[in-house]
A protein has these predicted regions:
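Bacterial carbohydrate/catabolite-sensing allosteric modules
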Residues: 1-123
């Protein structure tokens, strides 16, 4: 399932998306948020429901933030190679400036899943 969240209504849209995921005939058992803001909004809403992470709902975020360490179940996240992303972006920008034009370029970077308590159910 995919939920749409508008940046100007983040808390409300995240809450509505999670409500829908949980009310579905086949409710989700995990949520993957694509930004730190969405992850944090999701954690706030899940807490307001009294759900226990990860026992009742697992949470995975995208990208690292110290805020994930403050939660009672530190958040699992996808770690991006930020230094490599920055260097590649600068190279593309400098090439565009030197060549007085722009081109579309794609790049693939290795990521790492950092597994923490928010996605690991202990028996």
């Amino acid at each position: 399932m995919v939920g749409e969240v508008r940046i100007d209504h983040t808390d409300e849209d995240v809450a509505n998306a999670i409500k829908g995921f949980l009310a579905d005939e086949n409710p989700v058992d995990a949520i993957f948020a694509t930004t730190n803001l969405l992850t944090i909004c999701g954690l706030k809403y899940i807490n307001s429901l009294g759900l226990k992470i990860p026992d009742q709902l697992a949470v995975v975020g995208f990208d690292e933030t110290d805020a994930f360490d403050l939660f009672y179940a530190p958040v699992t996240y996808v770690k991006q190679p930020m230094a490599e992303l920055g260097l590649k972006s600068v190279r593309i920008l400098l090439d565009a400036i030197e060549k007085k034009g722009s081109s579309i370029e794609s790049a693939i970077f290795e990521t790492e899943l950092v597994v923490r308590k928010s996605s690991v159910v202990t028996l």
